């Protein structure tokens, strides 16, 4: 049974949610949702990448068309964060060095190499491993990495109404605070839950490893943040 205080808290929460989802933001540029260019195989020059990447045989390319096929299904609401982003089938050089193995996916806005230098040819890339494709997890891996891109490109300088003192990024990271897990990785996993077109056996590595679940309220807040910050 609801007590009066619990009912008041619920009504306050619902009212805040309605305000969050209905807030009107002055659009910049065209009113239509901007979209990334349709990915194409020739966007990635694998010969140059092979020559540029130091220390590891990391660029695969055998499943490049599969990766681009998955990239073409990214929801339109997330695409404003992906302007100029290229998708690469392979193992990111810096992540490979750090992990000692090939990461399923990596988002790299700065072009990091295994020698800890950055600014290389693969700046603003999302890498998807061949294993992610072979195991049928590429779509979830891509959404996770796109989540990192959204947080990096859209949430850092965006603010919820009446909460202008703290960025959307920081507010959302607070919702994913955890004693053992990196909240940024948990937040990226939440994009898989919130935006995946399938619901069976989602690949949410960090949620699974740390037995973490995002509440419906947090997922609603995440969707509202994407809507707000992509305008």
Q: Could you tell me what each predicted segment is?
A:
Residues 146-163, 187:
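Catalytic Zn2+-binding segment of zinc metalloproteases
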Residues 79-80, 117-122, 182-186:
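Extracellular/periplasmic catalytic domains that process cell-envelope and extracellular macromolecules
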Residues 166-231:
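Metalloprotease/metallohydrolase-associated module, dominated by Zn2+-dependent proteases
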């Amino acid at each position: 049974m609801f007590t009066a205080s619990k009912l008041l808290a619920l009504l306050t929460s619902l009212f805040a949610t309605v305000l969050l989802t209905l807030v009107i933001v002055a659009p910049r540029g065209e009113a239509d949702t901007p979209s990334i260019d349709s990915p194409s195989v020739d966007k990635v020059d694998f010969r140059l990448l092979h020559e540029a990447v130091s220390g590891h045989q990391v660029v695969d390319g055998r499943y490049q068309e599969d990766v681009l096929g998955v990239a073409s299904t990214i929801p339109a609401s997330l695409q404003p964060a992906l302007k100029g982003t290229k998708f690469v089938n392979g193992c990111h050089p810096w992540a490979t060095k750090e992990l000692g193995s090939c990461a399923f996916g990596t988002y790299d806005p700065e072009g990091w190499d295994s020698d800890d230098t950055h600014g290389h040819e693969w700046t603003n890339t999302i890498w998807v491993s061949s294993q992610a494709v072979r195991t049928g997890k590429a779509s979830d891996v891509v959404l996770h990495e796109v989540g990192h891109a959204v947080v990096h490109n859209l949430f850092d300088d965006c603010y919820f109404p009446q909460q202008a003192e703290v960025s959307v990024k920081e507010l959302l990271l607070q919702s994913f605070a955890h004693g053992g897990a990196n909240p940024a990785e948990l937040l990226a996993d939440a994009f898989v839950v919130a935006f995946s077109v399938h619901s069976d056996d989602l690949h949410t590595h960090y949620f699974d490893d740390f037995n973490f679940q995002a509440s419906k309220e947090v997922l609603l807040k995440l969707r509202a943040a994407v809507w707000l910050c992509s305008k």
